[in-house]
């Protein structure tokens, strides 16, 4: 039986996105265990995602999508990550790029006419959105040069997860005009553009199958009408309050799923022999760290439920992001000890989780800026330039 026959690909016959993720995850897990080349992008998994209903899951039903909430999307990604971290992390980038305009369509009706075409394309054409957030963040990156009718873009976007499968890169570039502060322009660029090239750069410790290659943009012209937003470079903007509040709970749900699977593998290995008191204590510590990661991710999702993105929700989300990473990494490190020497074998699958969880360290806000942001909030100081 083929993979397509193993799952029911008709979303209408599914109860939840978690049901779909659970069945797909079993397939993805088998593929990850059997992979001969971990550096290879998980293209076959994305093909299944594309026909499963998960690509359009976050689009409002009025626009043809599944109408999944951020909580449901987070649970979906957590479930996928339990089986294959690379697939889940790469897909989280598409997922948050859908969830953000979906939230705005629901809560910012004035923006709906601008957002609807993109959301309808995701629902109808099942296009994959890429995020260049790892390159751009608050400061922006790349150069936008004013030309007749638009802007010529020159940029190299690193950490573009899912690049081999992407249809539209959601990105930006910095426009510098005499006598004015640098401005970041936001826009989408079709990956089919002759001015766009995916560079084969992704050779990493973990999350090897995400295809997070550099994307080179040389001379693509974005029409003036295709720039829906612009902001000052190097300053937090209300748009980024929305982006960061929604995106990071989704991304860190992936790392929670990785940690949960590492825990279960370790317990399974430990049970194969008579555990001593030391192993029992390590297992208890591991479960406490995992509980900490779960609480941290839940706090992040609680910030989304407020439906009021602001500096305060950024603070809550980024505190959660830091705690989620810290506790998830600690849980997986303890899983290696609980498993003992058996966990050192690649066949166990634990060492892949150990490598994958390390990527939790590198997303914004990293520890220094995050602590500074939280401290400034506590002291009533400005935070608009802390990132």
Residue spans of the language-model regions?
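Glycine-rich beta->alpha junctions and the first turn(s) of the following alpha-helix
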Residues: 204-291
């Amino acid at each position: 039986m083929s993979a397509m026959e193993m799952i029911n690909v008709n979303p209408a016959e599914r109860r939840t996105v978690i049901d779909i993720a659970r069945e797909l995850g079993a397939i993805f897990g088998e593929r990850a265990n059997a992979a001969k080349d971990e550096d290879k992008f998980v293209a076959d998994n994305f093909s299944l995602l594309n026909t499963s209903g998960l690509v359009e899951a976050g689009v409002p039903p009025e626009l043809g999508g599944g109408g999944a909430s951020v909580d449901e999307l987070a649970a979906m990604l957590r479930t996928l990550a339990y089986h294959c971290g690379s697939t889940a992390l790469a897909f989280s980038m598409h997922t948050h790029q859908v969830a953000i305009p979906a939230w705005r369509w629901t809560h910012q009706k004035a923006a709906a006419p601008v957002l609807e075409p993109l959301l309808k394309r995701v629902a109808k054409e099942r296009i994959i959105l890429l995020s260049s957030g790892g390159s751009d963040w608050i400061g922006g990156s790349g150069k936008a040069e004013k030309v007749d009718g638009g802007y010529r873009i020159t940029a190299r976007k690193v950490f573009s997860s899912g690049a081999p499968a992407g249809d539209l890169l959601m990105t930006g570039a910095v426009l510098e005009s005499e006598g004015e502060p640098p401005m970041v322009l936001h826009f989408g660029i079709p990956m089919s553009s002759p001015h766009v090239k995916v560079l084969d750069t992704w050779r990493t410790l973990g999350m090897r199958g995400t295809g997070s290659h550099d994307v080179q943009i040389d001379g693509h012209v974005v029409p003036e009408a295709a720039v829906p937003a612009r902001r000052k470079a190097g300053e937090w903007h209300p748009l980024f309050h929305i982006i960061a509040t929604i995106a990071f709970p989704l991304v860190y749900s992936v790392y929670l799923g990785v940690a949960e699977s590492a825990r279960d593998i370790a317990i399974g290995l430990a049970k194969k022999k008579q555990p001593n008191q030391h192993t029992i204590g390590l297992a208890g510590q591991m479960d406490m760290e995992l509980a900490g990661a779960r609480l941290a991710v839940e706090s992040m999702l609680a910030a989304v439920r407020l439906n009021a993105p602001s500096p305060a929700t950024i603070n809550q989300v980024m505190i959660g992001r830091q705690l989620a990473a810290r506790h998830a990494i600690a849980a997986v490190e303890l899983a290696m000890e609980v498993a003992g020497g058996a966990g050192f074998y690649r066949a166990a699958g634990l060492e892949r989780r150990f490598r994958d969880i390390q990527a939790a360290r590198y997303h914004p806000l990293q520890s220094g800026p995050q602590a500074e942001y939280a401290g400034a909030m506590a002291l009533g100081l400005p935070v608009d330039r802390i990132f």
